[in-house]
Amino acid sequence: AKKVANLNSSGDRPNMMAGNISNSNIWNDKDKATHLEVEKMFTEMVGWAVDEGADMLIGETFYYAEEAYKALEVMQKTGLPSVITIAPMAENIMRDGVGIVDTCKELEQRGGQVVGMNCFRGPPTMLPYIKEIRNALKCHIAALPITYRTTEKNPTFFNLPDNNGCGCPTPHQTTFPTALDPMQVNRYEMGKFMKECFDLGINYLGVCCGANPMLIRETAHAVGLTVPASKYKEKMSNHFMYGTNKRIPKHMKDYGDK
């Protein structure tokens, strides 16, 4: 990762390599022994990142508030800039009972330089909380949604139903994780989310589970950037039925509404 970051890295926006830690999936708010085990894991992983020359550290996808606090504590000991993002489950509260916005407030108070949300939620169910977090905090805010159409009834992708006429149901009990394809947002939905966030002053933006180059490109365009992949953006003027290019025969255009 460091070698890739150093490729063509110059100017006022150099590439950065980030070290990463995330939810341990063993943290138990009622079992202090797991807290010590997780701290050891975080310390070891952060140490590896520092040894390899990380420019910054990211802690992400935490659904226990206290685990997020511990991750931030470990990262801050390095002196590197720290990003910390949470991923509350469908109950719309952290699993140890702390509110979503309150968790973010506490992370800011503890020194988080970028605080926000990532994963589990698509644009429709992440944006309302991102707006609240932006209003409540002064630090930089992060927003990295998944790429699926989550709803108020199903705010995360773990129990998202397929109501699109699926003829071959998933062998699992849920569409997660291997049958979410029909619920994916399109490029315009993702671009709209990113533009709304950027207009709110949120400048740490990305795409989480389900990300693809097209959606990353739309994110870049939403904040006014032109990137190498911009040349692949659709050019509908050349479409054989829906285009406006004078070379397109009229009888082909007429067929577009058939």
Over which residues does each language-model region extend?
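Domain-level signal for soluble alpha/beta catalytic cores
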Residues: 2-258
